[in-house]
């Protein structure tokens, strides 16, 4: 089964990749880059915002699935756009609550203030929320298409993007072929921009521009795919089987 395969191969592989790149980063740049704690705590808080944004969409969908309400939901006059709007609003509320809690804990336990990022913090957060939406809608479409066997993707899919999001290390640590993939990931540009602000104070205009453009294109594409998935599942009667 997919959960067993992921337990045996997926999570150990991701752990190896993430910690391997972090180790390379620390080994190569320890003498050049001060304040690793500043980078890591800031990155952790921002990453959790992306994760909660994605969870707000996928978990909302799974709750309808577990309640066996999926068929009734999409057989009603409810439009796919209204469903997405509601789940996106839920994700924003989750992000708001979790960010306040994490920022407060970081300040209380480590005297770390996320506001040191300055005026760029809000654009960073907004872009990460949109990236979370993209992953969430994509994951929801997969679960709708392939059924409950794919439920595990609600928690695991987002972490597939973590190595190429360059959360805890700069993009240049990655192999060249993986850097090319990371460049297509909006989150990677946000975390690169965060490190630029904390290390030099320079405005991350280029990083934000890339993130906004990529988020816009990917969001339009993934919403279009969601619409097609809903239509396909209705035509093939998959909503009945998914909800059972």
Name these PLM-found stretches.
Residues 1-244:
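Hydrophobic transmembrane alpha-helices and immediately adjacent juxtamembrane helices
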């Amino acid at each position: 089964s997919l959960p067993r395969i992921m337990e045996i191969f997926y999570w150990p592989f991701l752990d190896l990749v993430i910690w391997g790149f972090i180790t390379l980063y620390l080994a190569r740049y320890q003498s050049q880059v001060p304040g690793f704690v500043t980078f890591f705590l800031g990155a952790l808080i921002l990453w959790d915002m992306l994760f909660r944004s994605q969870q707000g969409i996928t978990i909302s969908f799974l709750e309808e699935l577990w309640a066996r309400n999926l068929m009734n939901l999409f057989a009603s006059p409810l439009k796919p756009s209204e469903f997405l709007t509601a789940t996106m609003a839920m994700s924003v509320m989750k992000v708001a609550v979790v960010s306040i809690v994490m920022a407060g804990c970081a300040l209380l336990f480590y005297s770390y203030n996320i506001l040191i990022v300055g005026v760029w913090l809000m654009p960073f957060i907004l872009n990460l929320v949109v990236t979370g939406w993209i992953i969430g809608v994509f994951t929801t479409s997969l679960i709708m298409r392939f059924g409950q066997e794919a439920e595990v993707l609600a928690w695991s899919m987002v972490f597939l993007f973590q190595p190429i999001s360059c959360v805890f290390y700069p993009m240049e640590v990655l192999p060249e072929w993986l850097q090319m993939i990371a460049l297509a990931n909006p989150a990677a540009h946000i975390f690169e921009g965060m490190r630029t602000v904390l290390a030099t104070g320079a405005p991350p205009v280029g990083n934000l521009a890339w993130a906004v453009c990529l988020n816009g294109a990917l969001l339009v594409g993934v919403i279009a795919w969601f619409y097609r998935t809903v239509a396909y599942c209705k035509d093939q009667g998959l909503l009945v089987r998914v909800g059972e």
